[in-house]
Structures are given as C-alpha cells and as structure tokens.
Amino acid sequence: MRYPFFAMVCFCVLIAPSRAADAPYVTTPQNVIDAMLKISKVAAADYVIDLGSGDGRVVITAAKSLGARGMGVELDANLVRTATRNAQREGVQDRVSFYKDDLFFADLSKATVITMYMSESVNLRLRPSLFKLKPGTRVVSHDFDMAQWTPDEKMTVPVPNKPYGQPKSDIFLWVVPADFSGAWTWRIPIAGINQEHEARFEQKFQVAEGKGRVASRAVPVGNVQIRGDTISFVMGATVDGKTTWRDFRGRISDDTITGSVFTVVEGDAVNKSQEPVVWRATRTARGKMIIDAATEFVDEDKVAALFLTKEQQ
C-alpha cells in the first residue's frame, strides 16, 4: 500500500565532512527507500537508525510499513521537530524518535540496521564507528560505497526523474563482520583419534585467509566466509591416501566458536560422507582485523559531479 506522505523523500546528503551542518536535500523517490529497507531485510524486530534523517521518512516508513522501531539523527533542529510531527501524523510516534545530534558522536549501539545517504568521505569517517556495532548489524547506503570495504550485496533501482547524475540509484549493503582474526584451536576425531587442530586467520573487513595445522602437520585452509557472527571454512587433510576436506561452520561469540563440521572424502559418491559433528573452537591469540582507511582516496570532484543537475551537466 502506498501513502501520499511517502511519495517522495528528502535525504540530507553530506557532500563533505565540513558541510555536514548545511548539507542540501536531494529528493529521493519511494522506490529507493523501499529498496533500502528490502535489501537490509528490515522487520518488526529491528531497530533502524537513520543518519542524517531529515524529516524522518526513512524511519517512519520502516515503522509504518514493516513494524520496526527506530530513531533519526539530524543536525537541523527544525527538521527534528518536523520529523517528530510527521511521526505523530502517521501514527508511529510510539515507535520512532528523532534527535538533534552529530552523527559522528551519536550512540548507535541499539541499531540492528543503519541507513544513510552521505558522501564516500563521510562514510569512511563513520566506518570505525560502524565496526564497533554488534556483528550482524546491517548497514545500507544510498549511492555511496565505502571504498575498500566491499559491499556484501548491491542493487540498482531506476530513478527516471533523478535531479542529478544518472537516472538510477545504487544501494549498498554491508553486514558488520565479527573479528575472526587470530589463532584458534580445537579437537575433533580423525580416523578414530582425537586430533589437535589449529588455524590462524588474517582478516581485512569481511575477507579472511587462513593457514592450518593438524597434529603439527601443515594443512590447507580455504573458502573462508564471514557474514556477521557466522563463519565457515574448509580444511584439508590426507587420511589413508585420500584427501579429506572438513567443512567447518559456526558462530562466533567473543573468543569461542560453536557449530558443526562436515567431512567430505575425495571420490565419495555422496556430498557429505558423514553426519555432522559438534565443533567448538577457542581463540588462543587475538589478531587484528584491518579496517584502516588511511590509505584510501576519495575523489571529491567525482563525488561533486554526481550532484550536478541535468541543466549543469
């Protein structure tokens, strides 16, 4: 169902950090908001925080259409008052709230979903704060990415009457990854003998590489995947002349992983040759997840060009 109130949306777009206080509004159609909420899978259990919330329509849409709760962070006190009135008018004042605050200092800890429409340079300044959020928190950005932190998902929606750039909008989704870096140990049976396993992982954003050892022998580790607090990887070993791959899947909580391991023997007719067994690993040494933006470059001329009107282009 469509609501006239949500026909068009104005986002506070931060062209550069120095302009955060006087950023212009750019009109955004409802289909972009719908796509942002869809790609981040917003549901009634979520708490949505919109950074640069303007008149509040992203959070209000999430509350009215999807039953979510949330808040907006906005520097302009007049817009905060407008957003509060709009929430009352739409009957969601008990589910949403709006605050005048600097987005770089706002408390984001309650968020399960962060929405934003800011320049890449501002995104990069925000990135360290986003990595402090609980693993699994979804971050969705309209039109601007986060340089070396590649999105987990991306979609493009048509915007025929967009007042700047191309007649489309890119929407990026990131899932805040758990810190999987460091050394992990565990024991599982191999050929009937409980064997000591060790794996060491280096991680940059949600991408990791590992090296493994089984009973002091080096073994390959590959296909490492991290999404929120869930991880998976495979570890190889040779047993009775056959290559055996173990598929580890689990969930991280601080320095512990709990999950299951499947065993696949090379040449088996079936994909999983054994029933999964419980797997529990302990981190014995912490690493350092790399999230440094110091070497990343943002082309502000390119950013500014995106906001040229059709008449200016």
PLM segments and residue spans:
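Conserved alpha-helix/loop element of class I SAM-dependent methyltransferases that forms part
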Residues: 27-45
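Conserved class I S-adenosyl-L-methionine
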Residues: 44-54
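Central antiparallel beta-sheet cores of small beta-barrel/beta-sandwich binding domains
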Residues: 178-277, 299-310
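A short SAM/SAH-binding and catalytic strip from SAM-dependent methyltransferases
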Residues: 109-125
